[in-house]
Each structure stands twice: as structure tokens, then as C-alpha cells.
């Protein structure tokens, strides 16, 4: 899982919640960890020495490995505009990333070139409107170095992360990190016999925003075909292939090279499609029947869905079951401001997610023809 941002939340009623762990990676990890497969999960991202202790504690409590969270030397002063022109969303040499355990050694080298300050942890305002629209405003200076922190080069991954059973990455649809995705594809599986002879592992790709302008066909095909799973929300899908029904969106994305497509629709659930078999499922969103599960904050729900979905696929489950795991995990995140306090791996959390999964599975519909 990639990307960590510390969010400062501003709600439509004027209330705020500061210093919340976010960025997509933690929420995806939460969704992944709610699955009964009890997978080990790690995060890869650049953080600063100011990374809040509370955020570190949450990762520990949820069984999320943090070795992949690395410090980044503050030696790249490129502007955001430069990052845009280069088209990579911000790139940095792997040598700029420093394992946190190495920081003390660097601090002791007072006169050495490495004895530099480190970039701060990525931090942003997340402003939610009454109609559900959310606007992100960077508090950390937006430059090439910041974007590199969100998706570090593959060569910075700890050795035990390489050969993982699955990777999940958020990318900009206009500037997909082709080099990173290709590197992760080569790393998948690591010879894990549990995956079977036909499947080395799963690479899941999620756009983290809508396209602001038409995407060239070549870029669209590179984006859709880079992974095994392509999971945009409905607005993101429309920005890529135009308006249409969820089934039409899935088919257009599949025609662009996506193998498994899952179009997430918020309160309307999701539609999942397998391009090879033509199988398509409509999965509802879960809503609690009592007030104990009132909607609190939808930030990160899509990420949690992706985590549960890819965990189901990595376990060898069918497309509809995997999508139900995703929807169940997303519903838990929606009932909390920020990441849930109760750890994903707790028996109580997993039992609640399983209960929701079973309820969703009974209501899931197979789409036949053009309906």
C-alpha cells in the first residue's frame, strides 16, 4: 500500500478534526486487514520526523508494518509546475530516501553531506461540503519532492516487501507512474506457491482524482492495462471514458485494457466486471439499520473498499465475494471520522465486517446482458 498524508478535516458544519491519519494507504490497509485471510500488510511512503506519534500508534495497533515509511532528504526544491511538466507527478532518486533507523547515524555525521534536514510529513486540509464534495488543499509545499514522497521509487521498498502477494497504488490518471507500476509488476509473487501456478500476484491501481482534461488513448490504455485491477469511482471513470451506465463504463475501461474493473459508486455500491469472462456483478453499499452506524465521514471509504476487494481476490475468492468484502470494509470506515479506532484485526471488527459481508452477498446481483 502506498501514500500517507496527515489530514486536517474541515466539515460542512464548521467542525474540525486535526492530525488524522490519511492519504489512502492507511485506509486501504485497514480494508485489507479486516479480511479473515489475516494478511500481513505494509505501507510505503515518505514521511517526516514530525510524523505524529498517534498515527504511528494506530499503525502498530492495526498490525500494519511501517518499515516502508522512510525519511526523505530535503534537497529537491523543484516547483509543482516543474513536476507537472515532467509528467511524472514528482520523482526523486532512491538515494533521497532514508530508513528511519538510519537517521541517528546521519545526525552523528555533522559535517557529512548526508547530515541534512528532512522533508516534513505530507499534510493537507480536507474540506467536505454538504453535498459530499471534498476539496484537498496542501499545507505542505506542493513540489516535486512532495509527490515523490507519496509514491516512492520501487527500489526503496524494504526487501521483504518485494515479492508481495499484492500491491495497491493510487495514481494520477493523466500522469500514471508507469515506471513504478512496471517495477511492482516485476516484483509480484516472489515465488509464493500459495498463489498457484497461474497467478503471480495482484497489482491494484486506483486513480486518486478525476482527469481534468481528455486523456489520450495511449495514456488511457497504459493506465488501464498496468495492473490486474483498475478501480476508479464513478466520477473518475466518467472523466476517462465519458458518461454512461456503470456497465458501460466497465466495458469501455475493459476495452482500454483493464482486466478486472470495479467502478465504485458511493452510496449506490459498486459494479465489478471481469473482462476475460464477461462476468459482472452489482454490489450494494451497506447501511446499518439502527443509529449505531450513522454516517460520519466518507473520506477514505473508496480506499478501504479497494483493500477489502483485493484481499478477497488475493484469497482466491470469486469476483462478487471480493466486492462484498470491499463494500463491508468501506461501510465501517464511513461510520468513523478518520480511520476507525478499533483495530482492523480485532476479532470484534472482523466479525462485524463478516456480518456485513454476508448481508451484502445476499443482495448482490449478477448483471446479464445490457441491464
Predicted feature locations:
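Short, hydrophobic/glycine-enriched beta-strand segments
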Residues: 1-5, 204
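Short catalytic helix/loop segments, enriched in acidic residues and glycine
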Residues: 14-30
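Short, conserved phosphate/pyrophosphate- and ester-handling motifs at nucleotide-, phospho-/glycolipid
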Residues: 32, 233, 302
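Conserved phosphate-binding/catalytic region of the ribokinase-like
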Residues: 189, 216, 246-371
Amino acid at each position: 500500500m502506498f501514500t500517507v498524508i496527515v489530514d486536517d478535516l474541515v466539515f460542512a458544519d464548521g467542525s474540525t478534526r486535526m492530525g488524522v491519519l490519511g492519504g489512502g494507504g492507511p485506509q486501504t490497509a485497514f480494508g485489507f486487514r479486516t479480511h479473515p485471510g489475516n494478511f500481513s500488510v505494509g505501507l510505503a511512503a515518505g514521511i517526516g520526523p514530525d510524523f505524529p506519534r498517534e498515527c504511528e500508534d494506530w499503525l502498530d495497533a492495526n498490525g500494519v508494518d511501517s518499515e516502508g515509511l522512510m525519511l526523505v532528504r530535503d534537497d529537491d526544491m523543484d516547483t509543482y509546475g516543474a513536476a507537472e511538466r515532467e509528467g511524472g507527478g514528482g520523482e526523486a532518486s532512491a538515494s533521497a530516501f532514508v530508513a528511519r533507523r538510519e537517521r541517528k547515524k546521519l545526525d552523528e555525521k555533522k559535517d557529512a553531506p548526508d547530515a541534512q534536514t528532512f522533508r516534513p510529513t505530507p499534510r493537507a486540509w480536507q474540506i467536505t461540503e454538504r453535498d459530499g464534495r471534498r476539496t484537498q488543499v496542501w499545507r505542505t509545499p506542493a513540489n516535486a519532492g512532495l509527490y515523490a514522497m507519496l509514491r516512492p521509487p520501487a527500489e526503496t521498498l524494504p526487501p521483504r516487501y518485494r515479492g508481495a502477494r499484492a500491491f495497491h497504488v493510487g495514481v494520477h490518471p493523466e500522469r500514471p507512474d508507469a515506471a513504478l507500476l512496471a517495477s511492482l509488476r516485476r516484483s509480484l509473487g516472489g515465488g509464493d506457491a500459495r498463489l498457484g501456478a497461474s497467478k503471480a500476484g495482484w497489482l491494484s491501481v486506483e486513480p486518486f482524482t478525476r482527469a481534468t482534461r481528455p486523456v489520450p488513448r495511449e495514456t488511457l490504455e497504459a493506465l488501464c492495462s498496468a495492473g490486474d485491477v483498475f478501480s476508479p469511482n464513478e466520477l473518475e471513470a466518467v472523466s476517462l471514458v465519458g458518461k454512461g451506465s456503470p456497465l458501460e463504463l466497465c466495458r469501455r475501461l475493459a476495452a482500454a485494457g483493464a482486466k478486472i474493473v470495479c467502478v465504485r459508486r458511493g452510496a449506490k455500491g459498486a459494479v465489478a466486471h471481469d473482462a476475460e469472462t464477461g462476468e459482472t456483478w452489482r454490489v450494494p453499499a451497506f447501511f446499518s439499520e439502527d443509529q449505531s452506524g450513522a454516517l460520519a465521514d466518507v473520506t477514505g471509504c473508496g480506499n478501504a473498499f479497494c483493500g477489502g476487494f483485493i484481499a478477497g481476490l488475493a484469497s482466491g475468492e470469486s469476483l462478487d465475494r471480493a466486492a462484498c468484502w470491499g463494500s463491508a470494509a468501506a461501510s465501517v470506515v464511513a461510520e468513523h471520522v478518520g480511520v476507525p479506532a478499533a483495530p482492523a484485526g480485532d476479532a470484534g471488527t472482523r466479525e462485524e465486517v463478516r456480518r456485513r459481508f454476508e448481508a451484502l452477498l445476499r443482495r448482490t446481483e449478477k448483471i446479464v446482458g445490457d441491464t
